[in-house]
Amino acid sequence: MPLTSPQVPTVEIDVFGHTIRLPELRRYRKFYDKLRAGKWEARTFQVLGKHLDEQTHYVDIGAWIGVTAFWASHVAKSVIAVEPDPDCVAILRQLSPSYPNVKVLAGALARGPDIRLHAVGDFGSSETTALNVGDGPSVLAKGLAIEEIMGQAAAGPVFVKIDIEGYEYEMASEIAKLRRYDLRGMQCAVHPQLLEKSLTGPLPLRRLRTLVKTWQFGRLLPGYYAVPGRRYSSFLSFLTFGIALRRVPGGTDLVYYKQA
């Protein structure tokens, strides 16, 4: 259910060498067990540790409850946490004063002035999406172009992380604008299963369209190459075994490294 209290109790958790403060809410307790055990997105923290330093800004588009944003505040010059989910925004705004170099932007990556978000179950989860695939309530959120988001980061190198639950495909042209900036790299979660679910037509056609759009997404940033999660040996392996040959496509985090 939506947050009704202006203040949420907090808990401190050690995550890959840094302590972060998060909301002490029952719905997140199982997740926190995984986080404490180092079993949640270990590769993400390795990637952030490699790319962030005191000269580099971090932009987190789809910041959820602040796990990676607050962790990055210990190592990055500044952090821009972008989040449209109303419950998550309330959490971020309450907790961010503990991290002076973190700025919260309430809104979603979009082309227009606003965008409708759909909850999966309820708001506050990590699955809120702009795709019309949720089974919960919906809300209108402020739309933020990539220029508005990147304008919040001061001059200097930047690393961008994006996790917007399937809407990354629709926002590909906005994300591609990142090549105009001093981009050290990017990590973007791709959700082909959500894309395929949102498409119409027979399954073979939807699967083909999903494959094509994902292939195009891997080539989004000229001068960078996309590397999927460890279970795949290459981007082609992800297309083949993660999408084409699976009953339901699987997602992965694509890390875009600058070519030498």
Could you tell me what each predicted segment is?
Residues M1-A260:
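Phosphate/nucleotide-binding beta-alpha loop and adjacent structural elements of enzyme active sites
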